[in-house]
UniProtKB/Swiss-Prot annotation:
Residue spans of biased composition, Basic and acidic residues class: 15-27, 49-93
Subcellular location field: Cell membrane; Cell projection, Growth cone
Chain positions found as Phosphoserine: S40, S91, S127, S130, S158, S165, S167, S170, S189, S212
Principal location class: membrane
Any GO BP: podocyte differentiation
Keywords, ordered alphabetically: Calmodulin-binding, Cell membrane, Cell projection, Isopeptide bond, Lipoprotein, Membrane, Myristate, Phosphoprotein, Ubl conjugation
GO cellular component: chromatin; COP9 signalosome; cytoplasm; growth cone; nuclear matrix; nuclear speck; nucleus; plasma membrane
Ubl conjugation listed as a keyword: yes
Tissue expr: Brain.
Lipidation (N-myristoyl glycine): G2
Protein name: Brain acid soluble protein 1
Gene behind this protein: Basp1
Length: 220
């Protein structure tokens, strides 16, 4: 009886040790699994935080990009506004510079103009007086006055020639206008007052000479 009990105890002890080893192994495996789970949880949490941070950074980057784009657009708009402003300023400056030289020739041309106009009416008045006197007086007196009228014509032309020579080339047309009244005076006086052919030819010959002298003075 005693031997059986001892065997049983020994066997029980052996079984107990095996069971304990199994329990320890099971507990170790359980602890390892728990450890892995615990480790994976922080990793998952870290991944979640990283995803959140990246998601937050993306809107920030997008906002920064939009702000930069708006700034670029504003700079472009400002540059476009400044460019048209600079162009009108340039055009205004050019317009101010261009009219400045223009008034000088205009004034110079206006100065000889009235002088020529003033001299031409005087010559016309002299011719009118000479023709009126020639109509009322005898033929002999008309011939004498005709000779005086052409003499006065060259004098007026000679007076006008220096003035034309002093002026610039832009005022050269003025002498031509002065020459026409003087040239018309001689034929008109010759046609109105009946006179011999010889005295009438002499004034006409004098008129071309005076015109040639005037042209020479203008060229000088």
């Amino acid at each position: 009886m005693g031997s059986k009990l001892s065997k049983k105890k020994k066997g029980y002890n052996v079984n107990d040790e095996k069971a304990k080893d199994k329990d320890k192994k099971a507990e170790g495996a359980g602890t390892e699994e728990e450890g892995t789970q615990k480790e994976s949880e922080p990793q998952a949490a870290a991944d979640a935080t990283e995803v959140k941070e990246s998601a937050e950074e993306k809107p920030k980057d997008a906002a920064d990009g939009e702000a930069k784009a708006e700034e670029k657009e504003a700079d472009k708009a400002a540059a476009k506004e400044e460019a048209p402003k600079a162009e009108p300023e340039k055009s205004e400056g050019a317009a101010e510079e261009q009219p400045e030289p223009a008034p000088a020739p205009e004034q110079e041309a206006a100065a000889p103009g009235p002088a020529a106009g003033g001299e031409a009416p005087k010559a016309g008045e002299a011719s009118a007086e000479s023709t009126g006197a020639a109509d009322g007086a005898p033929q002999e007196e008309g011939e004498a006055k005709k000779t005086e009228a052409p003499a006065a014509g060259p004098e007026a032309k000679s007076d006008a020639a220096p003035a034309a020579s002093d002026s610039k080339p832009s005022t050269e047309p003025a002498p031509s206008s002065k020459e026409t009244p003087a040239a018309s005076e001689a034929p008109s006086s010759a046609a109105k007052a009946p006179a011999p052919a010889a005295p009438a030819a002499e004034p006409q010959a004098e008129a071309p000479v005076a015109s040639s002298e005037q042209s020479v003075a203008v060229k000088e």
